[in-house]
UniProtKB/Swiss-Prot annotation:
<dbReference type="GO" id="GO:0006412">
    <property type="term" value="P:translation"/>
</dbReference>
<comment type="function">
    <text>Forms part of the ribosomal stalk, playing a central role in the interaction of the ribosome with GTP-bound translation factors.</text>
</comment>
<keyword id="KW-0689">Ribosomal protein</keyword>
<comment type="similarity">
    <text>Belongs to the universal ribosomal protein uL10 family.</text>
</comment>
<keyword id="KW-0694">RNA-binding</keyword>
<dbReference type="InterPro" id="IPR002363">
    <property type="entry name" value="Ribosomal_uL10_CS_bac"/>
</dbReference>
<dbReference type="Pfam" id="PF00466">
    <property type="entry name" value="Ribosomal_L10"/>
</dbReference>
<dbReference type="GO" id="GO:0070180">
    <property type="term" value="F:large ribosomal subunit rRNA binding"/>
</dbReference>
<dbReference type="InterPro" id="IPR022973">
    <property type="entry name" value="Ribosomal_uL10_bac"/>
</dbReference>
<keyword id="KW-0699">rRNA-binding</keyword>
<protein>
    <recommendedName>
        <fullName>Large ribosomal subunit protein uL10</fullName>
    </recommendedName>
</protein>
<dbReference type="GO" id="GO:0003735">
    <property type="term" value="F:structural constituent of ribosome"/>
</dbReference>
<keyword id="KW-0687">Ribonucleoprotein</keyword>
<dbReference type="GO" id="GO:0015934">
    <property type="term" value="C:large ribosomal subunit"/>
</dbReference>
<dbReference type="InterPro" id="IPR047865">
    <property type="entry name" value="Ribosomal_uL10_bac_type"/>
</dbReference>
<dbReference type="InterPro" id="IPR043141">
    <property type="entry name" value="Ribosomal_uL10-like_sf"/>
</dbReference>
<comment type="subunit">
    <text>Part of the ribosomal stalk of the 50S ribosomal subunit. The N-terminus interacts with L11 and the large rRNA to form the base of the stalk. The C-terminus forms an elongated spine to which L12 dimers bind in a sequential fashion forming a multimeric L10(L12)X complex.</text>
</comment>
């Protein structure tokens, strides 16, 4: 690879790091070309999966301000540059790795934070951002309904008490007064 090609490759990888919400590093040794194509399809259009040279990736990461991945750049490496939801990409990699054990997740960077392979697996176990937001909205809606019930309850109790007192006075108005002799 000529120097100009290396410079262009470093610039492209650095731009991928800058434009991604996450970058997950994997070892792809043992996967066929058709399996890599299947993985790219499974990750979707917002994720670019690229086989990279470790040395060029280290330089590009440094240029992009990405730290904590140098120790992951050992052996054959491919990077999933995630443009969309990091959780969805982590799930895609996890599911593909279950079906194809040759794919090994090494770790990565999510929103500027370096993560090891276990942290990426935990990320894959999370629910998507949309599901979490929907659950939070549902919980808030339930809490608001409970709060309205709590505020309305004292008023309705006062109204029921006033009605009971009125009914009691109407009943006692027609009764003879009771005298207490001592």
């Amino acid at each position: 690879m000529a120097n100009s090609e290396k410079t262009a490759a470093v610039a492209e990888i650095a731009e991928d790091f800058r434009g991604s919400s996450a970058a997950v590093l994997t070892e792809y040794r043992g996967l066929t070309v058709s399996q890599l194509t299947e993985l790219r399809r499974a990750l979707g259009e917002t994720t670019r999966y690229a086989v990279v040279k470790n040395t060029l990736t280290k330089i590009a990461a440094a240029q992009a301000g990405v730290t904590g991945i140098d120790e992951l750049l050992v052996g054959p490496t491919a990077v999933a540059f995630v443009g969309g939801d990091p959780v969805e990409a982590a799930k895609g990699l996890r599911d593909f790795a279950r079906a194809n054990p040759a794919l090994v997740v090494k770790g990565g960077v999510v929103e500027g934070k370096a993560m090891n392979a276990d942290e990426i697996r935990r990320l894959a176990d999370l629910e998507s951002r949309e599901v979490l937001l929907a659950k939070m909205a549902g919980a808030m809606n339930g809490s608001l309904a409970k709060a309205v019930g709590l505020f309305a309850a004292p008023l309705s109790q006062v109204a029921r008490l006033a009605e009971a007192l009125r009914a009691q006075r109407e009943e006692t108005a027609g009764a003879e007064p009771v005298s207490v002799d001592a």
